Amino acid sequence: MKKIWILRLFLGGCLSLCAQSKYPPIEELVYTGYYNWGFIWVKAGRVDFSLTTSEKYPNAERLKAVGYSLPSWDWIFTIRDTLISHFDKNTFMPYEFSRKAHEGNYHKTFDYTFHYDDSVVLGDIHRIGKFRRTDTVKLLGQTYDMLSVAWMARELDFDKYQKNDLIPIRILIDSKIYDLYIRYLGVVKSKIAGRKQECYVFSPLLVEGEVFKGGENMKIWLSKDEYRLPLMVEAKILVGSVKAILDRSASKYGDFTE
C-alpha cells in the first residue's frame, strides 16, 4: 500500500511537470522521474511533452503531457495521466484544457473551455462510475491552466529580476482560480545529467492538495540559453520528494540535448 501511494504522489508531482496530428511536433521533451526512497533515488516513471500546432484554434498551439508509471511499478499500481492544453502561441492564454487521470481503479476527467467574451470558464468534471457535474467559474484576467503556465514561465525575462523577486501568476486548478507567484532564485551553474550549464532557478508557490505540500516546495532549473529548457524539477510531496530530469529534447530546430 505504501508503494501505491508513493507512485501516485510521484507521478502527480512530475505532471505539475502523443496523439497523432497532421502537424509535426514543434517541440518534444522527455523526462525520467525519480522518487527519493530513503537515501537513494528510485526510477519510477516518465513524463512526455509534445507541442504541436493546434488544429482547433487559430494562432494557437496544442501542448500534451503524458505521465505514466514504469513497467516495474505497473504490477503494483498503474498510472496513465494525460493533460492537454490549447493556448494562444503569443500570450499563452488558454482556450481549452483537459486532464484524464487513470490511477489504479481511480478514473476521473476534467474538461474546461475558456470563454473570454463572457468572462467564464465552463467545466465538465466526471468521476467514472461515480458522478458527473458541470462547473462555471468566473474568468479573471491573465488566468493560465496547469500546462500553459509552464510554457509562459519559459518566456519570462528573468534577467530583469533580482534574486527573491516575486512574479505574480494566476492559475485555474480544479475549478478554482488561485493567485500565486514565482520566486526568482537567481542564476546558478549546475551539473544536470552529466552536463554543466548555467540555469535560471525559480520556485513556484504551490497549492496544497493530494500530492504537494503547500508553499515554496518546488524548484525548477531552466537553461540560460535561447531554448529555455526545463532541465530539472525537484519537489517535496506529502510523502518524501520527487525529481524529474530531462532525458531528451527535440524540435524543428534539432536536438538541444546532444
Where are these regions (language model features)?
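Short polybasic amphipathic segments
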Residues: 119-127, 169
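A contiguous pocket-lining binding segment that forms or flanks enzyme active sites
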Residues: 151-158
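Intrinsically disordered, low-complexity regions enriched in acidic/Ser/Thr/Pro/Gln residues
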Residues: 144-147
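Sec/Tat signal peptide C-region and signal peptidase I cleavage site
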Residues: 15-19
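Acidic/charged, solvent-exposed loop-and-adjacent secondary-structure segments enriched in E/D, K/R, S/T
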Residues: 126-141
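Sec-dependent N-terminal signal peptides
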Residues: 4-14
